[in-house]
Amino acid sequence: MSSSRPVFRSRWLPYLLVAPQLIITVIFFIWPAGEALWYSLQSVDPFGFSSQFVGLDNFVTLFHDSYYLDSFWTTIKFSTFVTVSGLLVSLFFAALVEYIVRGSRFYQTLMLLPYAVAPAVAAVLWIFLFNPGRGLITHFLAEFGYDWNHAQNSGQAMFLVVFASVWKQISYNFLFFYAALQSIPRSLIEAAAIDGAGPIRRFFKIALPLIAPVSFFLLVVNLVYAFFDTFPVIDAATSGGPVQATTTLIYKIYREGFTGLDLASSAAQSVVLMFLVIVLTVVQFRYVESKVRYQ
């Protein structure tokens, strides 16, 4: 089977088609990334008017800062909780669609509603429900003798931001898992049922391996989501507290750059975070292309 490359009448047309994307990439990624890398090697005054080259001193100081290391491990813990919990809960709800006979459309619509809610609004919603004084959920917990106050308890604060972040991301994961499960040939499921395999066994032995590429894709997407898109949730719910218990890397960058006006340190932290995201992207492009072949 022979293949030929498309031929454009004008030699400039391909460049014109690619130009908008290149311009957006340069303005909104390459230029800011270059600025962050430059500032990370400088000692900058709070207003950014003067600077002095200091090499890697900002990075050395960064990795000797106990508060930064704490935020680093907080990010690892937070992103792990958000990613694992979000994927498991979404997969469970997507698998339930097959067993809902009546009201399945309403169920699917209900599962997609959180996606229409902004992250900050999602955080405020759960803050109202978990309000220590008048929250509906805290009142219910008080009936069982459990005292809830996420402003003073670091574990409760972490649970709140993880819960709100997972709730916000459920719709996105549910949509992909549902589409992946529906794409599985029904003949495989029916053949396994005829052979005596129950619903649980059919799910773990047939469905789960076949949706592995989608699961891996969502794993990477949810890690990036936990690193970046959860900033509004943390800012609205806990502001990184109590005692920096919920201060992630992205929130520490914001606090030191915009509040503390330490541009060099925040730039160095941005470079470290950018490196982590690049690694995740490389992993995604390297492994997510694995194909599933139906025999």
Curated annotation (Swiss-Prot):
Q: How does it sit in the membrane?
A: Multi-pass membrane protein
Q: Which InterPro entries match?
A: MetI-like, MetI-like_sf, UgpAE/MalFG_permease
Q: Which PANTHER family match?
A: BLL4140 PROTEIN, SN-GLYCEROL-3-PHOSPHATE TRANSPORT SYSTEM PERMEASE PROTEIN UGPA
Gene Ontology cellular component annotations, sorted alphabetically: ATP-binding cassette (ABC) transporter complex, substrate-binding subunit-containing; glycerol-3-phosphate-transporting ATPase complex; membrane; plasma membrane
Concerning its family, UniProt says: Belongs to the binding-protein-dependent transport system permease family. UgpAE subfamily.
Tell me which parts of the chain lie in the Cytoplasmic compartment.
1-11, 102-109, 178-207, 284-295
Induction record: Induced by phosphate starvation, via PhoB. Also induced by carbon starvation, via the cAMP receptor protein (CRP).
TM spans, by residue?
12-32, 81-101, 110-130, 157-177, 208-228, 263-283
Covalent S-S links between cysteines: none
Organism, scientific name: Escherichia coli (strain K12)
State the protein's name: sn-glycerol-3-phosphate transport system permease protein UgpA
* Chief subcellular location: membrane
Q: Which UniProt keywords apply?
A: Cell inner membrane, Cell membrane, Membrane, Transmembrane, Transmembrane helix, Transport
Gene3D superfamilies the UniProt entry points to: MetI-like
Q: Name one GO biological process term.
A: glycerol-3-phosphate transmembrane transport
Could you tell me what this protein does?
Part of the ABC transporter complex UgpBAEC involved in sn-glycerol-3-phosphate (G3P) import. Probably responsible for the translocation of the substrate across the membrane. Can also transport glycerophosphoryl diesters, which are hydrolyzed to G3P and alcohol during transport. The G3P moiety can be detected in the cytoplasm whereas the corresponding alcohol is usually found in the culture medium.
| UniProt subcellular location | Cell inner membrane
Q: What happens when the gene is disrupted?
A: Mutant lacking this gene fails to grow on both glycerol-3-phosphate and glycerol-2-phosphate.
One term of GO molecular function? glycerol-3-phosphate transmembrane transporter activity
Q: Can you give the residue ranges of the ABC transmembrane type-1 domain?
A: 76-284
Q: Which domain of life is it from?
A: Bacteria
**On the Periplasmic side, which residues?**
33-80, 131-156, 229-262
